[in-house]
Amino acid sequence: EQYHEEKSPYSFQRKGCYYTDTLSREGKGALVKSGVGLTWSGFRPSDDACIYGYLIPSNMFATVVLGYMETIAHEVLKDEALAAEAASLKKEIHDAIESMAIVDNYYYGKVYAYEVDGYGQYMLMDDANVPSLLAMDYLGYEADDRQVVENTRNFVLSCANPYYYEGSCAKGVGSQHTKPGYIWHIALAIQGLTSKTKEEKLAILNTMKNTCLLYTSPSPRD
């Protein structure tokens, strides 16, 4: 959805629940600016409601999948019209990400926001669930500036990210979906898969080994 406000019939409301389990404005979600090139999401991969409806990791993933679609349409289906449509939409979303989702962080410089609304508001965070900002290299997103990618990774794996936690036994990214202070194995796996150093990969493997079980969210303090 690139015109959620004007054209979408979608809404979602749930009664008697926590605020992250339903959408505001009678189920439409927070207001976003239409026609900016980004695609709308009501909920994050964690199943929590988006604060701002343009979820950047999902838009990044969309550009990757549209690239696959372009290749399949061209090489397998021999459908040049479909290939051109996929390529055009991929470029539109990619350009919107690069122009609207890069913001300045006091500690890390230019980084990708997790969510934006198209009006200038944004959310600086990352969640353990994929697609995530931490997973952009794993998913295959092609950023215009690698320094922004590295800055974003450094931000995500720091206490500047409100869902990053450190304890005496482990450290990593957690989620709004579980209790504060708990890290997720899925984020540790993505961190390891995208790491460029053997030392970091080994440290993550040791962290996973020491928890004894691969479950959703261990405490880094136990």
Per-region residue spans from a language model:
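Intrinsically disordered, compositionally biased terminal peptides
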Residues: 1, 221-222
